[in-house]
Amino acid sequence: MRAALWTLGLGPLLLNLWAVPIGGPGALRLAYRHSTCDGVVLVRHHGAWGYVCNQEWTLAEASVVCRQLGCGPAVGAPKYVPLPGEMAQPWLHNVSCRGNESSLWECSLGSWCQSPCPHAWVVVALCSNGTFRELRLVKGRSPCAGLPEIRNVNGVDRLCVLHVEEAMVFCRELGCGPVLQAPRRDVGVVRKYLACRGTEPTIRSCRLDNNFRSGCDLRLDAEVVCSGHTEARLVGGEHPCAGRLEVTWGTVCDAALDLATAHVVCRELQCGAVVSTPEGARFGRGSGPVWTEAFRCAGNESLLFHCPRGRGSQCGHGHDAGLRCSEFRMVNGSSSCEGRVEFQVQGSWAPLCATHWDIADATVLCHQLNCGNAVAAPGGGHFGDGDAAIWPDAFHCEGTESYLWNCPVSTLGAPACAPGNTASAVCSGLAHALRLREGQSRCDGRVEVSLDGVWGRVLDDAWDLRGAGVVCRQLGCRGAQQAYDAPAPSRGSVQVALSRVRCLGTETRLTQCNVSATLQEPAGTSRDAGVVCSGEVGTASPMARRHGIPGALTLSLHREPQGAAGRGAGALHGGAWGTVCDDAWDLRDAHVVCRQLGCGRALSALGAAHFGAGAGRIWLDELGCQGHESALWQCPSAGWGRHDWRHKEDAGVFCSESVALRLRGGTCCCAGWLDVFYNGTWGAMCSNALKDLSLSIICKQLGCGVWGVGLAGEQALPLCGHRDRLGGQHRVPQAAQLHSVAMPFPPMAPALLRPSRAGLSEDRPQAAGEPLNCSSWLGCPEEGALRVRGGEDRCSGRVELWHAGSWGTVCDDGWDLADAEVVCRQLGCGRAVAALGAAAFGPGSGPVWLDEVGCRGSEASLWGCPAERWGRGDRAHEEDAGVRCWEPGPGPPLPAAPFRTFWVVSVVLGSLLGLLLLGLMAFLILPRVTQAMQRGLGRSEVSPGEAIYDVIGEMPPAGLYEEIMEAEAVLQDEEDGSVVKVDTEAAVSGEVSNLLEGQSIRAEGGHSRPVSQGYDEAAFPLEEMTL
């Protein structure tokens, strides 16, 4: 009957009718993912669950599944590769839905059978109520570049080893245009987390390979860059915040760069505010493509990527746009060229202390901000106090530097700034500033002019007295006495700005003359224009008078070139620095100098050029201070410039706040143990305080470059790097530029100096092997210390960092297994098991110190990873990041906490059960073996010491089996002559047992022995005996 129905073709029909289930929620579920609302589609049939096998699976079918399960709309319909331990049997084949059905059973269902299903046809549904949250590229310079990942509620799936097909779908779904860069196919492993054809509308429709979910090698991560990515940089400037503007990586036409766009670029590069936008390829001609689109920024965007674009203009590289930004600014004045001096610290503006601020520092700042020359440097909060805390950094400029960060900066030993004592500057406001170099005063020397903030030479061709007169007038000096040809500086050290200058003599500025602007030095020998003015105008400038500033008189202490712990007194008068003669120089004069400079009290007054002979003018002689004056020029003296001595008698002073540095015990002059001279004594410095900004300042102050590496403990040897290693950059490096010592700007605090043991001095240097252990002395964690809290042990919990005197947390934005790997390594806790977010170990307290951490996984510490600036976290503590590490030990790594107790109990119970089974087997088998051995006594023809070697599992030797089976074994007891009959099958069992043990036992003396009462005469068939 069955065969007949099958022959008629009714068999499959009846089978399908019999297999159709009664539809219902209990017959459908999603499995093998993070929640019940996303995962593999499973259906139940005859009490067993199986896959749905579809060659074509779209959002229409996935939408029906999500609707039936009450999980919201479908957001993805990918394919799936099962894990090795997951079920592999399919039940339902070829489902087709329109998308509006209320349950899967209303769709067109194919066959119900267990026919083989290709792995690529196993289907998945991702619903909106599931754990999937967002798709993004992280750790790049814009949302259209970075490492691809899928962020879920319970963590992040890093999508490593993707190729161009997957990158195409990624870029398309993010709205970032076509893919520009993707990992090569010959890089990394063959298998991938997901596989796309490149035509899918969403990455959720690509095929998932769940075998590879936890096998991502973070070292093989490669960045995906889409065409929508825009990244700005400045090239060819004198510091990292100035140069030719290039955007990924083409130049921009100068006509297309407006002030709003410039503000966004400066903000993106963390370079403060816009100073100027020089045109005409001021920073050199670029190469490669030129942007034909123009950025239409509003000015408040955080990235250039967010600015809309419009139609731009066509230009060549002769019109490449330039941009100059500055981390310094002047505020609260009548213009941007006067006001309170502020600079950017950790994204905020802070005023600078006026204690050490002088006209030389103001000169550099005015030039840096393209504001001409400095007119005055008033202190005492002349332009208001501001709302932020006053920053105590002290700049020691000569006045000729092109950028304020090029000046020596000191922070060690700086006393707290008095409230309201903020630094200020008043600049001339001329965009084209002028100065005279290498002369005896500010009114004679070689002419240099600043065009758009860049100092340049003025060549001597066509130079005459009329041009010199214009220069003297512009500088506020008296009439020109001489126009001469000055020796040019070394070729290439200063670029040429003007040539063929022809003036009428009536102009107010040199740039109003008939000039030729050029950046090229002509071939052959060229000399510069020089001028000598008849003298300085004795009155203050109009701008200085407007602000009630009596004049530009400044005092400073100049170090000798070797960096000894002391200062020579010097004064700035009439724009030129000069020294003080030691005639009648005593401690009362020194007290006035130390008080005026905010350096405490005078420890000693030194003469005879103790700190080396100075240069330039000798301004003061025969000083007669009483010690209570507020400024040195209030003391009686012989008058300005009146003296009868040379620089071999320059005066010097030691103040109680004097700080000097030296390196000793190293292999070169720029490596060694760091000693600090403070309050008249040499002492060691704790390595706790050696962060990258301090190291940079130390190396610059010692003339050893602009960056350093500090090694703590017994290897605390700061190693300084010279400028040529950083491509000529002179500023303090930012965290994103030097990852090897990448720490944010630390908060300013009194220097952590430890007094030397038994008065450390130059005569008794500390041994190079002595460690500087300051932990007990400091009584607080080291800056940047790391810990975990709220976990089960010391290797799991919420990640916390010590910074600025308090513990803070890390935001889980961008937090993944690579970041956790660095934390676990830094804690000495082995490998990372999980990177957790959403305050998995409870919310922390205090500030959120780090956000968007971007570790690669190979860094030695968390502060070596790129991240948002310290304290810039934009989340509350409900998104605190955590880690779970596996500390290497005798056992395998433990899983997450919810499963740990289960596995421990399972192992213990399994071990007890195994021991119980072994004991039971011994109890049952051992008596039988013993009795069988007793029964077989006397049957062997070999001695006890001989062994019978045979192959286990083969039959007994020929004849033995038949001999035993033909007759009963008879054992004669010599004492009573009784005969005992033995079951032949039991005897066979005993003989075989003896043979399997490799020996035969002979009965001794031929005596019969009684049979044990425990023998049950059970036979063991040969075919069932196995080892």
UniProtKB/Swiss-Prot annotation:
<feature type="domain" description="SRCR 7">
    <location>
        <begin position="661"/>
        <end position="761"/>
    </location>
</feature>
<keyword id="KW-0677">Repeat</keyword>
<feature type="disulfide bond">
    <location>
        <begin position="171"/>
        <end position="226"/>
    </location>
</feature>
<keyword id="KW-0325">Glycoprotein</keyword>
<feature type="disulfide bond">
    <location>
        <begin position="266"/>
        <end position="325"/>
    </location>
</feature>
<feature type="signal peptide">
    <location>
        <begin position="1"/>
        <end position="19"/>
    </location>
</feature>
<feature type="disulfide bond">
    <location>
        <begin position="297"/>
        <end position="307"/>
    </location>
</feature>
<feature type="disulfide bond">
    <location>
        <begin position="472"/>
        <end position="533"/>
    </location>
</feature>
<feature type="transmembrane region" description="Helical">
    <location>
        <begin position="907"/>
        <end position="927"/>
    </location>
</feature>
<feature type="topological domain" description="Extracellular">
    <location>
        <begin position="20"/>
        <end position="906"/>
    </location>
</feature>
<feature type="disulfide bond">
    <location>
        <begin position="366"/>
        <end position="427"/>
    </location>
</feature>
<feature type="disulfide bond">
    <location>
        <begin position="594"/>
        <end position="655"/>
    </location>
</feature>
<dbReference type="Pfam" id="PF00530">
    <property type="entry name" value="SRCR"/>
</dbReference>
<feature type="disulfide bond">
    <location>
        <begin position="66"/>
        <end position="127"/>
    </location>
</feature>
<feature type="disulfide bond">
    <location>
        <begin position="824"/>
        <end position="885"/>
    </location>
</feature>
<keyword id="KW-1133">Transmembrane helix</keyword>
<feature type="domain" description="SRCR 6">
    <location>
        <begin position="555"/>
        <end position="656"/>
    </location>
</feature>
<keyword id="KW-0732">Signal</keyword>
<feature type="disulfide bond">
    <location>
        <begin position="397"/>
        <end position="407"/>
    </location>
</feature>
<feature type="domain" description="SRCR 8">
    <location>
        <begin position="786"/>
        <end position="886"/>
    </location>
</feature>
<keyword id="KW-0472">Membrane</keyword>
<feature type="glycosylation site" description="N-linked (GlcNAc...) asparagine">
    <location>
        <position position="332"/>
    </location>
</feature>
<feature type="disulfide bond">
    <location>
        <begin position="503"/>
        <end position="513"/>
    </location>
</feature>
<feature type="disulfide bond">
    <location>
        <begin position="53"/>
        <end position="117"/>
    </location>
</feature>
<keyword id="KW-0391">Immunity</keyword>
<feature type="glycosylation site" description="N-linked (GlcNAc...) asparagine">
    <location>
        <position position="129"/>
    </location>
</feature>
<feature type="domain" description="SRCR 4">
    <location>
        <begin position="328"/>
        <end position="428"/>
    </location>
</feature>
<dbReference type="GO" id="GO:0005737">
    <property type="term" value="C:cytoplasm"/>
</dbReference>
<feature type="disulfide bond">
    <location>
        <begin position="196"/>
        <end position="206"/>
    </location>
</feature>
<dbReference type="GO" id="GO:0005886">
    <property type="term" value="C:plasma membrane"/>
</dbReference>
<dbReference type="InterPro" id="IPR001190">
    <property type="entry name" value="SRCR"/>
</dbReference>
<keyword id="KW-1015">Disulfide bond</keyword>
<protein>
    <recommendedName>
        <fullName>Scavenger receptor cysteine-rich domain-containing protein SCART1</fullName>
    </recommendedName>
</protein>
<feature type="topological domain" description="Cytoplasmic">
    <location>
        <begin position="928"/>
        <end position="1027"/>
    </location>
</feature>
<feature type="domain" description="SRCR 5">
    <location>
        <begin position="434"/>
        <end position="534"/>
    </location>
</feature>
<dbReference type="GO" id="GO:0002456">
    <property type="term" value="P:T cell mediated immunity"/>
</dbReference>
<comment type="function">
    <text>May play a role in the immune system, perhaps as a co-receptor on alphabeta and gammadelta T-cells.</text>
</comment>
<feature type="disulfide bond">
    <location>
        <begin position="97"/>
        <end position="107"/>
    </location>
</feature>
<feature type="domain" description="SRCR 1">
    <location>
        <begin position="28"/>
        <end position="128"/>
    </location>
</feature>
<feature type="disulfide bond">
    <location>
        <begin position="353"/>
        <end position="417"/>
    </location>
</feature>
<dbReference type="InterPro" id="IPR036772">
    <property type="entry name" value="SRCR-like_dom_sf"/>
</dbReference>
<feature type="domain" description="SRCR 2">
    <location>
        <begin position="135"/>
        <end position="227"/>
    </location>
</feature>
